[in-house]
Amino acid sequence: MQHQLKACGDVKTSSRAQQNHRRSTAASAKRSVGAGNSFLATDVTNLEMNSNFMTRKLKKNGNGVIGSPLSNGYFGAQLTANSFNYTPQANPYSNLDFQMAMGSGDVPSLMGMPVHKPSMMLQSDPSMDLTQFTEELQAIQNMPFQPISSSQAALQAFLAANEAASIGSYGFSKSQMLPSNSMRVSGARKNRIVEVKNQNDRLFLVLSDPQASVSTRPTLVPLTRPLQSVAQSCLDLTKKQPFSTEPLYSRKVFIGGLPIDVPDEEVYVTFGSFGKVLIDWPRRPEHNGRASDMYESEMGRRNLRSVSGYVFLVFTHEDSVQDLVNACEFYDGKYYLQLSSPTMQDKAVQVRPWRLSDIDYFSEEKVTVDPRRTVFIGGVPRPTRACDLARSLQDYYGKVSYVGIDIDPELKYPKGAARVTFATAQSFVRAISGRFVQVTHAETNKRVEIKPYVMEDQYCDECEGDLCKHNYAPYYCGDSSCLQYYCEGCWDRMHYEMGQSRADHRPMVRTGDQTRILPRPPHHPAAHHSHQRPQYLLHQDQLDNHHSSRGNSSVISRIVNRNSATMLDHVPGKPFSAISASYGY
């Protein structure tokens, strides 16, 4: 025990004890037993055994080790910039025996290796900085994906196959069904056209890029697990539901409540089994301007969390939507379907189809639609039905005879706007004067703006085309005191020459599908317009511009003031004419 303590440096050794230790070491070689093996001596410490063993090995290789003459005080020295140093550690081998062993070379190589001493004059190599490796390791550990269990060689052999019949068996785990290139680095998901095909009693998932050329071959992925995460009872119920030959839904379906970390392949398999479908992920702005690409993985993980958990499905055939709706569970007026992710098992996601019967609303079977009593409402929430919008307007302004939701002509999906026709002129005037309405549907509650519906191909209401050579009227006055279409001459005569009560009215024009309010008639030059308008009206325009800069004006005022600066400086070379647009109900 005394020799072990001395070897570990825990006891200060005297000179007499050192001489006794050398004698005992020499005597132990003579008293050793066991066929001349010196390591069987009872008074030989473990340190001496390792020293003797390493000494023989080093002498055989010819690589003697000389101990470092540096003291521990060097480790605490302050170095220059970009130089590295180490924190001083306590040396457990501080006795004289160990110092003599270092001088003689009778120590293992690791214990006798000279300490690395950076130069005080030279800059250190940047490759010695281990900070970047630490950050990259943390980023890799935090990435939200798992390695694919199948080998890369088998995957490449599968993708290189020319025919589906020649593809060998290839299994995928439930959470990883696609190759490693499907893992998102920047958090952006890619749109894919998905279709499930059966060939030779084997199921394959066909993936294609909607923006790729016709010559681009789709990707085939074999399926070795059930098609979808839907309960078998729901699948059996789908077959029992009556199928309508008439279209009932739009081919575009909204899926909400998706888990943030749901794999793309899980969405492909779940919804691709109902038919050929385009998976349309919502688009998010790219995050550019990063200082370095070192944090690419970490930034991708953050962006992935910020993506909303919803997706749009565009099926090729309408009957696929009926199958999807029949497979859902109906609860509290909503459709739900189960979907799994690495962190959530069988989560209920909302399936929101759009019924074609919700596009129009008629108060009576035979109702007359008067365009002169029609208003345009933009920013309508997409789930809002025509009957819901009619109910909201009737509570505020009066009876509504017709409501039409603007839809995409191909997909028949809402575009976020509507046209409403009131039953009486009084209700129409009240709606124009009120300008806003609160639309409530399910969990949505939004305040939208009401504007007169401006039509194309309308003659002037004052001259009926006699003073403008029977050209269509380019302006519409949406003020409650006018509500008429005007040609250029009648606009000046009714708003400036007949009196100043209407001089502050602003013309409304139809531009495509939008209705815009202009700050002045476009056929007036800036100087001519400012000369005819009174000073108090010009002051009022300055106040409007001031309020719009503060962000307190309406949507229409912001549009007008945004374009006023360029329009005042530019004199049109020819009379203004509205852009042609089709009109119909």
Curated annotation (Swiss-Prot):
GO molecular function, one term: mRNA 3'-UTR binding
Gene behind the chain: cpb-1
Source species: Caenorhabditis briggsae
Protein name: Cytoplasmic polyadenylation element-binding protein 1
Keywords associated with the record: Developmental protein, Differentiation, Repeat, RNA-binding, Spermatogenesis
GO BP: cell differentiation; meiotic cell cycle; negative regulation of cytoplasmic translation; spermatogenesis
Composition skew (Basic residues), residue ranges: 521-532
A GO cellular-component term linked to this record: cytoplasm
InterPro entries, A to Z: CEBP_ZZ, CEBP_ZZ_sf, CPEB, Nucleotide-bd_a/b_plait_sf, RBD_domain_sf, RRM_dom
